[in-house]
């Protein structure tokens, strides 16, 4: 019997373990951290052996194949040992893809992928299609393949997941944009990160579709290198060469495969970045044959994504917006661009090799004050202090950051949490960071 070892027992790993067990493999799960009770219960209910708090190498190095959590770097010592002895190391998505014939709509990009994924899922669900949501959001793809049957899966993919995918094929691949992110995981080499993102197109055939932002200079440059077989569906803000989806005369237009249009003001999501998300989602739904009426309705009644430009409250004339999901500089750029009032920006956290010059002009134009929130704020001081804005340095946590921002903000201004950084210095996750922000805003 083939032995499969799963490293990491979160949503992805626990789901992969269940699928491996259901398919008759000898299955073992190992996690360096504590495993959440709900995942222990899931593993126990399927009689899957597991360990937590350490990796027992002799129980791992004898695997025929290893499924790795996306959070474990490819250069982790244990992964290097496995690769050195020739043991295949794959992702949960790669493993799950072997056991389903469902259509795969896969979304990646440095920014916008969660909103776009959620919006595509909303359109498909609203059209009464049998659809699952998986990848970075929703339920583990492997668990759904093991326990449910869907005709379509809408899958958000990070570069870390794509790194360990080899034979998986996306029927529709969506690439929103490529800007510097996670460079700490890619030896601070931008090309390594770009190559990871473009893995979403590998194995695509002439029957498949590749949807991408036509104005992204990196994507345009890379297209020529990759010799893609898939049919190309570029989108842009305005009508231009090659774009099959754009806005013209305040109207959203998609010209292929079926002509579609709707008034831009009817879109539920506002702001330039959300226009791109809506265009990519509209093309995906159009390709799946969803009716124009269903696409229009779903694009106009979508409720948005938590922690992404989420309006929290207005306190004594000051608006508070939670954009905790902005874990890179480009995400913050989009958030600042959408601000219509003077803004107190809360930023900081675990820096991933950030270049803050991208937001320099917007910070100078839009911000009235800055709150640095993190254990190590030296880089923020070095870059932003010269702007001459009032600054608060907070190293203790979200409560103090919210109170500092509230004191700095004037009536009619906005406090924006858009950190540019990962959350792991002071918080468990970007969700934890956003939840704490909302909690302390509501306590003001």
Q: Could you say what each language-model-derived stretch is?
A:
Residues 26-32, 210-214, 346-347, 366-375:
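Short internal beta-strands
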Residues 51-54, 90-94, 227-247, 298-300, ...:
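Beta-strand->loop->alpha-helix junctions that form or flank phosphate-binding loops
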Residues 3, 15-23, 262-367:
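Nucleotide phosphate-binding/pyrophosphate-handling subdomain across enzymes
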Residues 39-40, 357-413:
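C-terminal helical cap/extension that packs against the catalytic core
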Residues 1-91, 95:
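N-terminal leader/targeting and accessory segments in enzymes
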Residues 10, 33-35, 137, 215-216, ...:
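Residues in the short beta-alpha loop(s) of Rossmann-like NAD(P)-binding domains
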Residues 20, 66, 107, 136, ...:
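Residue-level signal for inorganic ion chemistry
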């Amino acid at each position: 019997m083939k032995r499969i070892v799963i490293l990491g027992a979160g949503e992805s790993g626990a789901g992969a373990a269940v699928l491996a067990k259901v398919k008759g493999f000898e299955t073992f799960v190992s996690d360096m951290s504590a495993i959440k009770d709900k995942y222990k219960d899931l593993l126990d209910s399927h009689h899957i052996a597991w360990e937590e708090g350490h990796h027992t190498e002799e129980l791992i190095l004898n695997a025929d194949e290893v499924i790795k959590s996306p959070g474990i770097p490819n250069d982790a010592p244990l992964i290097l040992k496995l690769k050195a002895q020739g043991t295949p190391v794959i992702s949960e998505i790669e493993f799950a893809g072997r056991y389903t014939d469902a259509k795969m709509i896969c979304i990646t990009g440095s920014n916008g992928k969660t909103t776009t994924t959620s919006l595509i899922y909303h359109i498909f669900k609203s059209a009464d299609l049998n659809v699952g949501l998986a990848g970075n959001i929703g339920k583990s793809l492997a668990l759904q393949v093991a326990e449910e049957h869907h005709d379509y899966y809408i899958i958000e993919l990070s570069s870390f997941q794509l790194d360990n995918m080899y034979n998986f094929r996306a029927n529709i691949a969506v690439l929103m944009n490529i800007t510097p992110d996670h460079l700490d995981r890619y030896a601070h080499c931008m090309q390594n990160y770009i190559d990871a993102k473009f893995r979403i197109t590998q194995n695509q055939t002439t029957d498949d579709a590749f949807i991408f932002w036509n104005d992204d200079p990196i994507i345009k440059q890379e297209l020529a290198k990759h010799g893609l077989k898939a049919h190309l569906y570029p989108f842009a803000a305005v009508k231009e060469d090659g774009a099959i989806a754009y806005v013209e005369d305040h109207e959203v237009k998609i010209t292929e495969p079926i002509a579609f249009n709707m008034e831009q003001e009817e879109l539920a999501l506002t702001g330039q970045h959300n226009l791109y998300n809506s265009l990519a989602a509209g093309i995906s739904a159009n390709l799946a044959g969803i009716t124009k009426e269903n696409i229009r309705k779903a694009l106009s009644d979508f409720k948005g994504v938590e922690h992404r430009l989420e309006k929290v409250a207005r306190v004594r004339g000051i608006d508070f917006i939670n954009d905790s999901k902005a874990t890179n500089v480009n995400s913050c750029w989009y958030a600042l661009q959408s601000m219509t009032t003077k803004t107190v920006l809360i930023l900081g956290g675990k820096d991933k090799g950030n270049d803050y010059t991208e937001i320099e002009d917007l910070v100078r134009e839009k911000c009235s004050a800055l709150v640095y929130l993190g254990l190590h704020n030296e880089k923020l001081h070095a870059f932003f202090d010269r702007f001459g804005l009032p600054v608060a340095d907070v190293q203790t946590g979200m409560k103090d950051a919210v109170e500092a921002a509230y004191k700095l903000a004037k009536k009619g201004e906005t406090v924006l949490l858009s950190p540019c950084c990962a959350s792991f210095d002071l918080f468990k996750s970007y969700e934890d960071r956003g939840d704490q922000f909302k909690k302390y805003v509501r306590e003001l």
